[in-house]
């Protein structure tokens, strides 16, 4: 039986190779130390029997090598400026927290149609071709009944997101054909962004099951 140890010191800070960041391998490995730092304000979760711990990734001299670090710094800067303004109005606060609830719109396309389009495969969007026979002029898709296979996809997506602690709230059709939307419950900014990334990952993982 394999036994793995994970200490609190390793949780607070790790030291992986950062030679590929931020520009794709311009630095020698021996000169490219990077550090992972635990983000204790974002929830850890279990995915595929693996404990996933949200972290920030910075260089030896403190430069951001990821997209989470600038977000955390932006939240802190916004809090500092909001506190400064509030003090002008006589309010004594220690921290101002921001919340967001990013809606995730998406298209569900049959696998055979997707694989026939190089633009979809390479860029995730259509770059050429004739306009759709039916566009966004009418409202019957937005207010229409959700198709059974789409509803089944949405149900499984909700269940998998709840297992990861992502609080999905509403789901509905969107305006364009094959377009749909998932709306989460508002949460602290960095937590909401982590949840949004998990949502997109689970969508891509579950969708192929439904053709």
Model regions: which residues?
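Glycine-rich, acidic/polar active-site loops that bind/position phosphate-bearing ligands
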Residues: 1-211
């Amino acid at each position: 039986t394999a036994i793995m140890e994970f200490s609190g010191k390793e949780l607070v800070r790790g030291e992986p190779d950062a030679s590929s960041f931020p520009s794709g391998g311009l630095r020698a490995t021996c000169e490219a130390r990077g550090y992972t730092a635990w983000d204790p304000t974002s929830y850890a979760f279990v995915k595929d029997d693996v404990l996933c711990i949200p972290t920030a990734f910075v260089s030896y001299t403190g430069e951001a090598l990821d997209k989470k670090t600038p977000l955390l710094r932006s939240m802190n800067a916004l809090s500092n400026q909001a506190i400064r303004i509030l003090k002008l109005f006589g309010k004594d606060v220690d921290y101002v927290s921001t919340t967001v609830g990013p809606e995730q719109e998406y298209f569900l396309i049959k696998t055979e149609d997707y694989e026939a389009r190089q633009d979809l495969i390479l860029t995730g969007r259509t770059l050429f071709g004739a306009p759709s026979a039916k566009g966004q002029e009418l409202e019957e898709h937005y207010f229409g009944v959700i198709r059974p296979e789409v509803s089944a996809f949405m149900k499984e997506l909700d269940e998998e997101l709840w297992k990861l602690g992502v609080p999905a709230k509403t789901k509905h059709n969107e305006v364009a054909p094959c377009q749909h939307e998932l709306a989460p419950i508002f949460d602290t900014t960095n937590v909401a962004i982590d949840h949004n990334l998990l949502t997109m990952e689970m969508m891509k993982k579950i969708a192929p099951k439904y053709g």
